[in-house]
């Protein structure tokens, strides 16, 4: 996940996640508004979406928070889900080559990702780019990981 200030070309933050990146409302009493693009195509006809949580998940992470929101898992691509949105939008699974872009149109918000205590405060105008990492992850286990699609 890469975060840019409004209008900036140089990122103010870059982070990596194995499971998911999520944007959550920054204040308990204020939902967040944003616009989203899948590559350069506006999502949901470019409407401004009001939400409590917006998540982009990997297949590995789809069994966790993504599943809690959507009641589904996936084995390839990236999953985009919304929790407590006022819009009639569906969760979507996109090819792993797609870049998910979002811009906060009303904040504040918080960016968090799995297994870390760190988070990043976001404000109105901040832009996010979420994509599959070019660096593969190494998972150490006692036994082999598998799934029905052998995607892990």
Language-model features, listed with the residues they occupy:
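Catalytic phosphate-donor-binding core of small-molecule kinases
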Residues: 1-54, 60-152
């Amino acid at each position: 996940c890469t975060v840019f200030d409004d209008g900036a070309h140089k990122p103010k933050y870059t982070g990596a996640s194995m499971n998911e990146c999520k944007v959550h409302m920054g204040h308990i009493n204020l939902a967040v508004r944003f616009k989203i693009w899948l590559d350069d195509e506006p999502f949901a006809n470019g409407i401004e979406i009001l939400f409590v949580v917006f998540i982009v998940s990997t297949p590995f992470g789809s069994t966790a928070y993504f599943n809690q929101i959507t009641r589904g898992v996936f084995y390839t691509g990236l999953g985009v889900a919304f929790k407590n949105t006022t819009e009639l939008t569906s969760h979507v699974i996109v090819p792993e080559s797609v870049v998910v872009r979002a811009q906060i149109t009303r904040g504040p918000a918080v960016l968090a990702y799995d297994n870390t205590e760190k988070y990043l405060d976001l404000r109105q105008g901040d832009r996010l780019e979420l994509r599959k990492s070019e660096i593969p992850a190494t998972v150490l286990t006692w036994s082999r990981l598998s799934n029905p699609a052998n995607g892990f």
